């Protein structure tokens, strides 16, 4: 019962930022711009994904002092990233009071086999996923929120679209099997393909969606990108390099918030898309060497 209550509390926090935008920020000034623009939360980190991609090296948890400065400067929730499998980084982030930990493929993985046991923490976690199997495995580990991995730091939404479609197609298969009474196929799918408990599959079949909040992330650079992901069924969006690598961050931040909230209103999206200045310079995915792709980290 205690574990269930903890899961409910963690998922409850994730629902609080539903329909909102979480923005990457690297300092107090950016955090205040994000809050003024209407961000639901900020992600505090020392380097945005675009810089991590260019500069290379080992990307680790940010300096706790920087995270605390941002926490002191804003009234909205503050998230921070830990490396995949690095449970001590997560312990540190929990100890300084971050509102949510992102076990992130954007940072250099600390463990190439295991993710963090998120059920051992009171802080909620968000994790990336490219398909239904990855999403459900992270939820089984205790994740309270899922996001598409996309391909962070590219300004190119194509991978986020691919990952959201894969999750949706997986859910449709589960629902279809359930409606046709194909229980044996569901059991086989859970055991051999998705590698998750049958209870999670049953929950997906009943809800016809993931049992936790599911955000878009990775390559979102424009208001239209945000609205696209929302129309595909996302519950909100993370925007990393797309805001503060653009020509007019404050205006673009507000526009993305408006487009996320009004995702089904093309006239509003068109209006907020006017005169935003230059978007971040994007990268075509096929120009990225295989070993530099971030989304492949952590399955």
Curated annotation (Swiss-Prot):
In the presence of PdxT, forms a dodecamer of heterodimers. D-glyceraldehyde 3-phosphate binds at residue 165. This is Pyridoxal 5'-phosphate synthase subunit PdxS. It comes from the Archaea. It is an enzyme of class 4 (lyase). Belongs to the PdxS/SNZ family. SUPFAM superfamilies: Ribulose-phoshate binding barrel. Its EC number is 4.3.3.6. Catalyzes the formation of pyridoxal 5'-phosphate from ribose 5-phosphate (RBP), glyceraldehyde 3-phosphate (G3P) and ammonia. The ammonia is provided by the PdxT subunit. Can also use ribulose 5-phosphate and dihydroxyacetone phosphate as substrates, resulting from enzyme-catalyzed isomerization of RBP and G3P, respectively. Pathway: Cofactor biosynthesis; pyridoxal 5'-phosphate biosynthesis. GO terms for biological process: amino acid metabolic process; pyridoxal phosphate biosynthetic process; pyridoxine biosynthetic process. Gene3D superfamilies: Aldolase class I. The active site is at residue 81. GO terms for molecular function: pyridoxal 5'-phosphate synthase (glutamine hydrolysing) activity. It catalyses: aldehydo-D-ribose 5-phosphate + D-glyceraldehyde 3-phosphate + L-glutamine = pyridoxal 5'-phosphate + L-glutamate + phosphate + 3 H2O + H(+). D-ribose 5-phosphate binds at residues 24, 153, 219, 240-241. Pfam families: SOR_SNZ. Keywords: Lyase, Pyridoxal phosphate, Schiff base. The keyword Lyase applies. PROSITE patterns: PDXS_SNZ_1, PDXS_SNZ_2. Signal peptide: none annotated.
């Amino acid at each position: 019962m205690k574990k269930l209550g903890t899961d409910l509390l963690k998922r409850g926090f994730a629902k609080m930022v539903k329909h909102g935008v979480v923005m990457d920020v690297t300092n107090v000034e950016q955090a205040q711009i994000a809050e003024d623009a209407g961000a639901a939360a900020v992600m505090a980190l020392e380097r945005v994904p675009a810089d991590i991609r260019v500069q290379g090296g080992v990307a680790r948890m940010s300096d706790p002092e920087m995270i605390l400065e941002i926490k002191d400067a804003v009234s909205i929730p503050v998230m921070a990233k830990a490396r995949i499998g690095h449970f001590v980084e997560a312990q540190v982030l929990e100890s300084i009071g971050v509102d949510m930990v992102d076990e992130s493929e954007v940072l250099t993985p600390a463990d190439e086999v295991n993710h963090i046991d998120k059920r051992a923490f009171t802080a909620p976690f968000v994790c990336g996923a490219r398909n239904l199997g990855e999403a459900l495995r992270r939820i089984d580990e205790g994740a309270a929120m899922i996001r598409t991995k996309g391909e962070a730091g590219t300004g190119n939404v194509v991978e986020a679209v691919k990952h959201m479609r894969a999750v949706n197609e997986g859910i449709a298969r589960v629902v279809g099997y359930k409606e046709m009474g194909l229980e044996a196929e569901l059991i086989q799918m859970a055991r051999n393909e998705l590698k998750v408990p049958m209870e999670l599959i049953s929950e997906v079949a009943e809800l016809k969606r993931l049992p936790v909040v599911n955000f878009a992330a990775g390559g979102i650079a424009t208001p239209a990108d945000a609205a696209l992901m929302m129309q595909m069924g996302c519950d909100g969006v993370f925007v990393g390099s797309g805001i503060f690598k653009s020509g007019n961050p404050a205006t673009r931040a507000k526009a993305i918030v408006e487009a996320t909230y009004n995702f089904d209103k093309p006239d509003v999206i068109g209006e907020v898309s006017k005169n935003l200045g230059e978007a971040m310079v994007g990268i075509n995915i096929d120009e990225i060497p295989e070993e530099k792709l971030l989304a492949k980290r952590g399955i």
